[in-house]
């Protein structure tokens, strides 16, 4: 079994030293879903929400969050991201919004946390913008879809 990389031999949390690691292209994709009533989803789709374009706001929030992950998650490294994408898709058949994020850089550590943070904050932004209309929305199934680059190789969710 692999060891936790952020815990030293004394059991103390520390930031991982990546100074001797090779720079490689790192890519990560993550997703999240927001489940809601059909009426709430239709309000988002039609653009009739009184706060404005929900998808545009959530997209920008997700991008901003990816760039600030190191400030939110203890022990994450500040990264020079070369690409952040946040895609939002309305799924009327399940009354959900699907969010997919992609983060990319050339560096010494991965971008999984940045991708997960982007998807999560985009979902939280949808909730925030729509909570006046519906408070029982559910943010669910936040997960890493893909990561590549680095010593640990490639990962693809099933």
From Swiss-Prot:
Pathway linked to the protein: Cofactor biosynthesis; molybdopterin biosynthesis
GO molecular function, one term: cyclic pyranopterin monophosphate synthase activity
EC number: 4.6.1.17
Listed InterPro entries: MoaC, MoaC_bact/euk, MoaC_sf, MoCo_biosynth_MoaA/MoaC, Mopterin_CF_biosynth-C_dom
SUPFAM superfamilies cross-referenced by the UniProt entry: Molybdenum cofactor biosynthesis protein C, MoaC
One Pfam family here: MoaC
Domain of life: Bacteria
Reactions it catalyzes: (8S)-3',8-cyclo-7,8-dihydroguanosine 5'-triphosphate = cyclic pyranopterin phosphate + diphosphate
Binding annotation for substrate: 75-77, 113-114
Signal peptide (from-to): none
Positions annotated as active site in the UniProt record: 128
Keywords from the named record: Lyase, Molybdenum cofactor biosynthesis
GO biological process: Mo-molybdopterin cofactor biosynthetic process
Entry function: Catalyzes the conversion of (8S)-3',8-cyclo-7,8-dihydroguanosine 5'-triphosphate to cyclic pyranopterin monophosphate (cPMP).
Subunit structure: Homohexamer; trimer of dimers.
NCBIfam families hit by this protein: moaC (TIGR00581), PRK09364.1 (NF006870)
Family: Belongs to the MoaC family.
Name of the protein this chain belongs to: Cyclic pyranopterin monophosphate synthase
